[in-house]
C-alpha cells in the first residue's frame, strides 16, 4: 500500500511537471513575436533585443519594481511619507502610496534568485514573470481535481484553467501585470483551505491555514 502511494505521488509530480512545461511553453512563444516577418522583427524589439512589453501597464509595473529595488519604496520620491511618482501625470506626478506591491515583491525575489546563477536584467526577469507565475496554477488545479476524479479528469481541468483564453492572453511572456495572480493565488487559497479543514493533525491544519491566508 505504501509503495502504491509513493508511485501515485511520483506519477502526479511527473504529470504536473509536464503540464507546467506545456502551459509555460505556450506562453513563452510570445517572445518569438510569431506572425511578424523576420525582416521587420527588429522594429518590435528594444535596444537590448528584448520584445517590447505588450501594454503600457507593464512598463508602469516595471518602473515601480525598479523604484522598490533602488530605494525601497514605490515612486521617485516621498511626499508626506507616501510614494510619489513624478513620471505619471507629468509634471505634477501622482501618489502611488496605494500601489499593490505583490508584483514588485515577487519580481524582485525572482530577480535575486535568477542572478545567483546568471546575469539577467530586471527587465528580462519581468518579461518572463507573468508566464512563470501563471503557469503555477497547474499545481492546485491538478491536485484538487485529481482527488475528486482521476488523472484524466485532473489533466483536462488543468488545461482548461491554465489555458483559458482570457487568462493566457493576459499572462503570456511580455505581459507584466497583476493578472498573473488572478487565478493562481485564489486556486492555492482553495487548495490550502481544503487541506486545513481535512487534515487530521493540528500542526498541519495551522500550516495550511497560514498558507491559505498568505494566498488571499
PLM region descriptions:
Residues 1-45, 56, 155:
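Start-transfer (signal-anchor) and selected internal transmembrane alpha helices
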Residues 1-13, 28, 101, 105, ...:
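Membrane-embedded, hydrophobic transmembrane alpha-helices
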Residues 15-27, 110, 142, 188-192:
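Hydrophobic core segments of alpha-helical transmembrane domains in multi-pass membrane transport
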Residues 32-64, 70-71, 82:
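Low-complexity, proline/glycine-enriched hydrophobic segments characteristic of transmembrane helices
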Residues 60-68, 77, 82-118:
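Short hydrophobic/aromatic helix or loop-helix immediately within or flanking a transmembrane segment
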Residues 68-73, 113-114, 136, 143:
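Sec/Tat-exported extracytoplasmic proteins
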Residues 79-84, 128-147, 152-216:
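Membrane-embedded helix bundles of polyisoprenyl
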Residues 90-105, 115-136, 172-180:
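Loop-to-helix entry region of an early transmembrane alpha helix in multi-pass inner-membrane enzymes
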Amino acid at each position: 500500500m505504501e509503495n502504491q502511494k509513493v508511485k501515485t505521488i511520483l506519477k502526479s509530480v511527473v504529470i504536473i511537471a509536464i503540464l507546467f512545461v506545456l502551459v509555460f511553453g505556450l506562453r513563452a512563444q510570445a517572445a518569438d513575436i510569431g506572425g511578424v516577418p523576420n525582416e521587420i522583427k527588429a522594429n518590435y524589439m528594444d535596444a537590448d533585443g528584448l520584445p517590447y512589453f505588450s501594454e503600457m501597464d507593464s512598463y508602469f509595473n516595471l518602473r515601480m519594481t525598479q523604484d522598490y529595488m533602488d530605494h525601497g519604496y514605490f515612486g521617485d520620491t516621498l511626499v508626506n511619507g507616501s510614494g510619489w511618482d513624478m513620471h505619471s501625470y507629468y509634471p505634477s506626478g501622482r501618489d502611488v502610496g496605494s500601489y499593490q506591491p505583490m508584483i514588485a515583491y515577487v519580481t524582485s525575489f525572482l530577480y535575486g534568485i535568477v542572478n545567483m546563477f546568471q546575469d539577467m536584467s530586471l527587465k528580462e526577469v519581468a518579461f518572463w514573470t507573468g508566464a512563470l507565475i501563471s503557469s503555477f496554477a497547474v499545481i492546485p488545479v491538478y491536485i484538487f481535481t485529481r482527488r475528486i476524479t482521476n488523472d484524466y479528469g485532473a489533466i483536462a481541468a488543468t488545461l482548461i484553467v491554465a489555458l483559458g483564453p482570457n487568462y493566457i492572453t493576459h499572462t503570456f511572456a511580455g505581459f507584466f501585470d497583476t493578472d498573473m495572480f488572478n487565478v493562481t493565488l485564489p486556486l492555492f487559497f482553495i487548495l490550502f483551505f481544503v487541506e486545513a479543514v481535512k487534515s487530521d493533525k493540528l500542526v498541519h491544519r495551522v500550516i495550511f491555514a497560514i498558507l491559505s491566508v498568505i494566498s488571499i
